[in-house]
């Protein structure tokens, strides 16, 4: 095995976020308010199953322990179960997760688990069915809730729920969310709204710091937990009276990037060193044949030397990220 992926700032990278499509059937206000429009797809289309197999093998050989399958909506891929199984072929990858809008969970989550999936994140921005419809453009609230129940029934001990925190939309609904997770092993993660190229007006209107939630949690006796090395950037809080947990993801917080441990590969095979970085390094020409593994690994290692110490969101620089479906958030 090659040496562990490490950048110029001694950060080690154990975590790959792999987008398998940028197509999504929801129209979330903060991501694709006008619905999906094909943009970044080349004539080759999205990564094939064999290309996914090769890129994940290269990352596994470079020390990756966790792969998250993202989109768009990854479950729109008809071969999604095969994708999970292909990633599972790497014994050093201990965690295989998916981030999903949840609309296919009730139908398919048991099959995903059987294929090798170890963790599920579901996007739910409101626990009010009408507001959920207004945010997502889809009247699927009950279907998504049934999907979360199905994930528990399939044997997942914990489900993570991602909630984009928005001023005057859901920031004042903390009590509703806390009641929901009191008797459920759900880690509810409030994610600060991030500015994207297409979403700057929305950002100015609805951004609110996660610190408002953190202050309220601490006031109510919630306890800040320590992070493990393959964890994401969430600050996680627990409470003895609650089965669930609260996570806060605050990209505008000081030193947010100091604990960065993930790299991203887009659905067309570009390596992105940062969600809000410029450009991307094309890996696709090295995904055609089995004999290209050494060259592929070398390109990944070389590219990592160019990773910057921090994003530049504070200066309003969102890089190439026009919307979050492009790289997979």
UniProtKB/Swiss-Prot annotation:
Classification via InterPro entries: Aldolase_TIM, Elp3/MiaA/NifB-like_rSAM, MoaA, MoaA_NifB_PqqE_Fe-S-bd_CS, MoaA_twitch, MoCo_biosynth_MoaA/MoaC, rSAM
Cofactor: binding comment: Binds 2 [4Fe-4S] clusters. Binds 1 [4Fe-4S] cluster coordinated with 3 cysteines and an exchangeable S-adenosyl-L-methionine and 1 [4Fe-4S] cluster coordinated with 3 cysteines and the GTP-derived substrate.
GO MF annotations in UniProt: 4 iron, 4 sulfur cluster binding; cyclic pyranopterin monophosphate synthase activity; GTP 3',8'-cyclase activity; GTP binding; metal ion binding; S-adenosyl-L-methionine binding
GO BP, sorted A to Z: Mo-molybdopterin cofactor biosynthetic process
Residue numbers binding GTP: 17, 68, 99, 160, 262-264
Keyword Cell membrane set for record: no
Top-level lineage group: Bacteria
Keywords, in A-Z order: 4Fe-4S, GTP-binding, Iron, Iron-sulfur, Lyase, Metal-binding, Molybdenum cofactor biosynthesis, Nucleotide-binding, S-adenosyl-L-methionine
Database matches in Gene3D superfamilies: Aldolase class I
Residues reported to bind S-adenosyl-L-methionine: 30, 72, 123, 194
Binding site for [4Fe-4S] cluster 2: 257, 260, 274
Disulfide bonds: none
EC number of the protein: 4.1.99.22
PROSITE patterns to which the protein is assigned, alphabetical: MOAA_NIFB_PQQE, RADICAL_SAM
Domain named Radical SAM core: residues: 8-234
This protein's record includes keyword Kinase: no
Reaction(s) this enzyme catalyzes, per UniProt: GTP + AH2 + S-adenosyl-L-methionine = (8S)-3',8-cyclo-7,8-dihydroguanosine 5'-triphosphate + 5'-deoxyadenosine + L-methionine + A + H(+)
Pathway connected to this protein: Cofactor biosynthesis; molybdopterin biosynthesis
Binding site for [4Fe-4S] cluster 1: 24, 28, 31
Role summary: Catalyzes the cyclization of GTP to (8S)-3',8-cyclo-7,8-dihydroguanosine 5'-triphosphate.
Subunit comment: Monomer and homodimer.
Family (UniProt): Belongs to the radical SAM superfamily. MoaA family.
Protein name according to UniProt: GTP 3',8-cyclase
Lineage: Bacteria, Pseudomonadati, Pseudomonadota, Gammaproteobacteria, Enterobacterales
